[in-house]
């Protein structure tokens, strides 16, 4: 299942993850991780989506820069991480955000909000990465993996829009538009993937 979402299968299968399972990619690669505290974007009963998008863009650039200055446990991991420009951006404190919004952690609304925030962050990250690649050139494995990467991006877009997927053996769970408590976030998620 995870390999159906693999952006670089021409360079090998995904065979495992890091210990926390947030990073799944090629053997002997690593990525620098960063997490944004979601609660910092919530004030006066409203989630500041504009600030969240801005922070996502800044962290994407920061993580790209960090590839050049990171220390890795071996030369091979350092080289492959440089070659593939791996980065990992996530968020923390979804529970705190949901509690402050009065939403249950396991509620349909809570899951839909989480899905929308994840879709926004991931779509904006991909779009920002593409902007950097346009100016600086893509990572070295892009050309041989281009069609796979673009299919994965189209499938993320399909999940945001709730449309058909390509080449998945297990259908993805689409963004739950109906239960998201902030419809502006649904629209932002869709537009983020339209831009990616």
Placement of each model-derived feature along the sequence:
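Function-dense linear segments that define catalytic or interfacial modules
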Residues: 1-101
């Amino acid at each position: 299942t995870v390999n159906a979402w693999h952006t670089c299968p021409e360079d090998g299968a995904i065979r495992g993850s890091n210990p926390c399972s947030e990073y799944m990619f090629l053997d002997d690669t690593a990525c620098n991780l960063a997490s944004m505290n979601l609660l910092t974007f919530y004030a006066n009963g409203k989630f500041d989506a504009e600030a969240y998008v801005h922070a996502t863009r800044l962290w994407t650039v920061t993580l790209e820069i960090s590839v050049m200055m990171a220390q890795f446990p071996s030369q091979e991991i350092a080289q492959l991480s440089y070659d593939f420009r791996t980065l990992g951006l996530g968020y923390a404190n979804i529970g705190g955000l949901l509690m402050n919004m009065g939403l249950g952690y396991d509620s349909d609304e809570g899951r839909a909000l989480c899905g929308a925030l994840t879709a926004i962050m991931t779509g904006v990250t991909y779009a920002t990465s593409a902007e950097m690649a346009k100016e600086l050139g893509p990572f070295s494995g892009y050309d041989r993996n281009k069609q796979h990467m673009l299919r994965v991006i189209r499938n993320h877009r399909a999940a945001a829009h709730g449309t058909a997927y390509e080449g998945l053996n297990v259908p993805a769970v689409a963004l739950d538009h109906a239960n998201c408590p902030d419809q502006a976030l649904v629209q932002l998620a869709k537009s983020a993937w339209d831009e990616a």
